[in-house]
Amino acid sequence: MADGEDIQPLVCDNGTGMVKAGFAGDDAPRAVFPSIVGRPRHTGVMVGMGQKDAYVGDEAQSKRGILTLKYPIEHGIVSNWDDMEKIWHHTFYNELRVAPEEHPVLLTEAPLNPKANREKMTQIMFETFNVPAMYVAIQAVLSLYASGRTTGIVLDSGDGVSHTVPIYEGYALPHAILRLDLAGRDLTDSLMKILTERGYMFTTTAEREIVRDIKEKLAYVALDYEQELETAKSSSSVEKNYELPDGQVITIGAERFRCPEVLFQPSLIGMEAPGIHETTYNSIMKCDVDIRKDLYGNIVLSGGSTMFPGIADRMSKEITALAPSSMKIKVVAPPERKYSVWIGGSILASLSTFQQMWISKSEYDESGPSIVHRKCF
């Protein structure tokens, strides 16, 4: 395999919250780190520490006390290209330890990513990193491939944004894609707020990470929200303890399901938007009547914010209530869905049929960044 390793494609899934990167053909990403770039708040505090002008990922996270943290990706879309370049540089050279000029690179993008963004991504890959070939794939489509399907509707909910993406025979249907600016980060904020009401103060960026951990470890989706609230009032069956880094132990009860309930009832945090179940239904209704049956039968969950226990059953219950009564509804929640975008990319980049799909350096040199619209769709 010494030979193959050289040309093994790299797969990099850039999320709002986490970067997932690794080698095509692997079954999991080698590197998973926060999509953050930290810059020192005060220059020269750490004299003689060989202070860098910027820290990326876990290092930024661990030094967060002295840094200002920035997320270059907002709502799934790159908004700060200088920082994004730093993240890619860190991915190739520090995490994967590869020379990008020796490997084809598969990148992922949010559904409905603006055209200028795809071009900028393409340009940076070829001009800054000198990659021999690259491709840009839509995240939700990769998740569907990872589940072994080519037709279905994907609810992809990450840290910064959620999308419902109907896909037919491998192609996303852009007119029916819906975006919901409600995702993991909002759930963390909402839990911070609920905990503040109870007298626990979480305010800084560092403390937000603690709340995120509480959310990931303890939150779940109730099948029947009102009934669960009653249960929580009358018994302590939903209560769990969590030990903070300083040793203080807090007890959380109804907060455990109040937090992800926001996905189904955005009005709980004052958002005027339909919940994920309604958004999924609306997406299906924007599709041709002939393919709806295939979509209802293949609702695939993807992304970190679909990892809550109970979410698939609740989703199934809510969509059954909206859909025609005779319709067969199936909600699929693959256990590896936190990384299914990356896994789908790994599968796609290793297919022999995919090898002619790459945009090569020579094609880029000939046509410029707009080549991406002709070759990646």
Swiss-Prot record:
GO molecular function, one term: hydrolase activity
Stimuli inducing this protein: Differentially regulated in response to exogenous hormone treatment. In particular, auxin is a strong inducer.
GO biological process: cell division; Golgi to plasma membrane transport; protein localization; protein transport; response to auxin; response to light stimulus; response to wounding; root development
Alphabetized Pfam families for the sequence: Actin
Phenotype when changing T108I: In act7-8; impaired trafficking and endocytic recycling of ABCG36/PEN3 between the trans-Golgi network and the plasma membrane in root epidermal and cap cells
Deletion consequences: Impaired trafficking and endocytic recycling of ABCG36/PEN3 between the trans-Golgi network and the plasma membrane in root epidermal and cap cells.
Principal cellular location given in the protein's record: cytoplasm
GO cellular component, one term: nucleolus
Annotated catalysed reactions: ATP + H2O = ADP + phosphate + H(+)
SUPFAM superfamilies registered for this protein in UniProt: Actin-like ATPase domain
Domain of life of the native organism: Eukaryota
EC top class, as a word: hydrolase
Record keyword Manganese present: no
Enzyme Commission number(s) of this protein: 3.6.4.-
More about this protein: There are 8 actin genes in A.thaliana.
Family assignment from sequence similarity: Belongs to the actin family.
PANTHER family linked to this entry: ACTIN
UniProt name for this protein: Actin-7
Source organism (scientific name): Arabidopsis thaliana
Species lineage: Eukaryota, Viridiplantae, Streptophyta, Embryophyta, Tracheophyta
